[in-house]
């Protein structure tokens, strides 16, 4: 009886998140970018071995590239391929999106940061955002607000 009512839990579509980016920047405008990956990288992402902590987006010659993202190779990866965990990966964006990103970075002083990696219809996607850096007092204010909201939720749950 108990087994029939339980549903199998679907795997999460999110592979990795860049929490550091959410803490250090005001995220303004988000874009969904595809990634040019090798076979071993897709396998390691399926195993959840992606890391965006030190990653950033570099705009060069009308193209966007993901630098510093670590995709740890699996032990069972191919022997004839030499995997490089921190290689530069090209981001795939539409021409208009690239124009908006370039304009935001060059004219408006935004920074382009990767926010998360996720699966969409079997393809690995990277959520990138145009962001402004937070000052120290902004970070403190965000932390205080988060703590205050947690305290409010605790009080409401106890009633």
From Swiss-Prot:
Alphabetized InterPro entries for the sequence: SmpB (IPR023620), SsrA-bd_prot (IPR000037), SsrA-bd_prot_CS (IPR020081)
Keyword annotations of the record: Cytoplasm, RNA-binding
The keyword Cytoplasm is annotated on this UniProt entry: yes
SUPFAM superfamilies, per database record: Small protein B (SmpB)
Gene Ontology MF term list: RNA binding
RNA-binding among keywords: yes
Sequence segments annotated as region (Disordered): 140-159
Membrane spanning residue stretches: none
Source domain of life: Bacteria
CDD domains: SmpB
GO cellular component terms, semicolon-separated: cytosol
Cellular localization per UniProt: Cytoplasm
Pfam families named in the record: SmpB
GO terms under biological process: trans-translation
Basic and acidic residues: compositionally biased ranges: 140-150
Family to which this protein belongs: Belongs to the SmpB family.
Described purpose of this protein according to its UniProt entry: Required for rescue of stalled ribosomes mediated by trans-translation. Binds to transfer-messenger RNA (tmRNA), required for stable association of tmRNA with ribosomes. tmRNA and SmpB together mimic tRNA shape, replacing the anticodon stem-loop with SmpB. tmRNA is encoded by the ssrA gene; the 2 termini fold to resemble tRNA(Ala) and it encodes a 'tag peptide', a short internal open reading frame. During trans-translation Ala-aminoacylated tmRNA acts like a tRNA, entering the A-site of stalled ribosomes, displacing the stalled mRNA.
NCBIfam families, sorted: PRK05422.1 (NF003843), smpB (TIGR00086)
Record's protein name: SsrA-binding protein
Origin species: Alcanivorax borkumensis (strain ATCC 700651 / DSM 11573 / NCIMB 13689 / SK2)
Gene: smpB
């Amino acid at each position: 009886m108990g087994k029939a009512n339980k549903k199998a839990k679907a795997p999460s579509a999110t592979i990795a998140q860049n929490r550091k980016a959410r803490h250090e920047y005001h995220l303004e405008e988000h874009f969904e970018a595809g990634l040019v990956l090798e076979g071993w990288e897709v396998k390691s992402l399926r195993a959840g071995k992606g890391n965006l902590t030190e990653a950033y987006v570099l705009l060069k010659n009308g193209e966007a590239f993901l630098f510093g993202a670590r995709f740890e190779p699996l032990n069972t990866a191919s022997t004839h391929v030499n995997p490089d965990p921190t290689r530069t990966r090209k981001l795939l964006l539409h021409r208009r999106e690239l124009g908006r990103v370039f304009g935001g970075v060059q004219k408006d002083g935004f920074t382009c940061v990767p926010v998360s990696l996720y699966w969409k219809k079997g393809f690995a996607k990277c959520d990138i955002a145009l962001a402004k850096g937070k000052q120290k007092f902004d970070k403190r204010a965000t932390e205080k607000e988060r703590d205050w909201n947690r305290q409010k939720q605790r009080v409401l749950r106890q009633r």
